[in-house]
Regions:
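The feature captures the beta-strand-to-loop junction immediately N-terminal to the Walker
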Residues: 41-43
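Conserved ABC ATPase signature
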Residues: 148-152, 156
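Catalytic Walker B motif of ABC-type/P-loop ATPase nucleotide-binding domains
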Residues: 173-176
Length: 240
């Protein structure tokens, strides 16, 4: 079953004070089956993050379709979907992890993870138990659980970001350089979590500059330079 299909995706940005338009991505095309992991590779500035943000609808694309096979709405074009539909999907089906933590002020680490579960309809007790499991798993110091994240280091913020997204066990998870500022032990934890989510059926699309991290994880690779997708067989990409 195809979980995500991107057809002819295009996105440009206008720099108004220079009266200039920059094309970020053009005619992007790929598909991901349920439970697969697609890795997107390419040099900095090639538009990798733009693709993920377009899928999550942080950016509204200028052209093409992004067809997602949702549990709630069936097949839906994320470009044409209403704001209400997008908010529902973000809360219940689609997760996003970036290098940066952007959260509500005066909300503790514990509350942020619990709220991610509560908005899905989980009970307070279930949210409490699963939150503590997630924070422990990603080795967040227990002394930080009731602290505000603006005091955290970059690595701590990133681990919290990952915990918030993965605790929900989303149907589709978008990963934008989620291991950028992590040490090797934390990277292993993230890899183990990704493998666990895959086993549970989560579909993933991710960007990693750490090629070694991606090895053995990805089922497919999309190359921004060639604008082509390949299937990974025994660690080596082959054209699909």
């Amino acid at each position: 079953m195809t979980m995500l299909e991107v057809n002819g995706l295009g996105k440009a940005f206008t720099i108004h004070h220079l009266n200039k338009t920059i094309l970020a991505v053009d005619e992007i095309q790929f598909s991901v089956h349920a439970g697969e992991f697609l890795g997107i590779i390419g040099k900095s500035g090639s538009g990798k993050s733009t693709i993920l943000k377009s899928i999550y609808r942080t950016y509204l694309s200028d052209a093409g379709q992004i067809i997602y096979d949702s549990k709630q709405f069936g097949k839906i074009d994320l470009i044409q979907a209403s704001e209400r539909e997008i908010i529902f999907l973000r809360k219940n089906e689609i997760g996003y992890v970036s290098q940066f933590l952007n959260v509500m002020p005066r909300t503790t680490c514990r509350e942020l993870v619990q709220n991610a579960l509560l908005e899905m309809g989980e009970t307070k007790e279930t949210a409490r138990i699963e939150t503590e499991k997630a924070l422990s798993y990603f080795e967040m110091d227990e002394g930080l659980w009731d602290s505000y994240p603006n005091t955290f280091s970059g690595g701590e913020k990133l681990r919290l970001n990952i915990a918030m997204a993965t605790v929900k066990k989303p149907r589709l998870l978008l990963l934008d350089e989620p291991t950028a500022s992590l040490d090797q032990q934390s990277k292993r934890k993230v890899r183990e979590m990704i493998e666990k989510l895959k086993q549970q059926g989560t579909t993933l699309v991710g960007i990693f500059h750490d090629i070694e991290f991606m090895e053995g994880l990805c089922d497919k690779v999309f190359d921004m330079k060639s604008n082509e997708m390949s299937v990974v067989l025994e660690g080596v990409p082959h054209e699909s």
